[in-house]
Amino acid sequence: MRYVEGSVTTGPKRISKIGLGTWQFGSREWGYGSGYAATDAADIVRRALELGITLFDTAEVYGTGRSERILGAALANDPDAPRRAYLATKIMPVVPVAPVVEQRAVASAARLGTRHLDLYQVHQPNPLIRDRWTMPGMSALRAVGLVGDVGVSNYSLDRWREADAALGAPVLSNQVQYSLARPRHGAALVDFAAAESRIVIAYSPLAQGLLSGRYDASNRPAGRVRSVNSLFLPENLDRAAPLLDTLREVARAHDATPSQIALAWAIHHPQVVAIPGASSVSQLESNAAAADLYLADDEYDALTAASDRFTPTTGTANLAALARSALRR
């Protein structure tokens, strides 16, 4: 496992380049079945720690708190987890004023069974309540030791800078959708992270499985989450074919899978980490192995060029297409 070097994190823990996203813990929409939360999730967390994964990401809205509870219970099985696990969760900023921020952090910590949140993130920008009303709550949480680092999620670069100013200290991270399917989404953020020793946390780094190479227009994925993702419309799967071909070509050169190469691309930049989910221990192991893959410059450039040529259809026109697709299933 590789770890981030030279970031402005306030604590002693290392942040792994490949982490574990736990949206699927306790969330029925992924279709993993009732036994997943009871047994598989704990096995996945245990194996993640064994493999050197330290970054575990969750949120209060994942399964309406169940993800935090499941993750906390799984980490409690390892007496060394408090020393090694870098625990990150998020507040959904419905009314993100300081007293609410403080209350929600206490509730998240209780569900996670911890007295310290290594990273507490604002899940998305509130368009009406600016960060100057939110960040005093974060400062108070840091002052009492409940929170170590402060992060944001789905923030533009300008809004990230605004959060910095409101906190009066570096906001360590910005968690955004960043992958070969959506590289333009985070390019400016990555440049900022490099200049300021921050971190970009890439969620959905495999584009919900698109970059695994398992799917095409004749073999589309099931499940409610992917059924509303326009990337899986037949026309977009056709458009993704050249990108997937390039992924497979690079994967063959490394005796790796397309998913592993997609993750290696995402974490190629020193200040980017990725938090793929895992439906099984074997998938987790495959994801973790991507941290040890190093892409040559020409491979990285070829993947980036193929990604730039991938232009999925987007916008309101997709709503009708998604509705038609759902009716055909």
Language-model-detected regions and their locations in the chain:
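N-terminal binding-site loop/beta-alpha segment at the start of enzyme catalytic domains
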Residues: M1-A85
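Short, acidic/polar
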Residues: S34-A48, V97-L112, S156-R161
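A structural motif
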Residues: I53, T114-L117, V147, Q271
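Beta/alpha (TIM)-barrel catalytic core signal, keyed to glycine-rich beta->alpha loops juxtaposed to Asp/Glu
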Residues: R2, P125-R329
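Acidic (Asp/Glu)-rich catalytic clusters
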Residues: P12-R14, G72-R83, V106-T114, R142, ...
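Alpha-helix N-cap and loop-to-helix initiation/capping positions
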Residues: Y32-D40, R66, I70, P96-R104, ...
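Active-site groove signature of glycoside hydrolases
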Residues: L112-L128
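A short, structured active-site edge motif that brings together acidic residues
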Residues: P82-V95, L119-H123, Q177-Y178
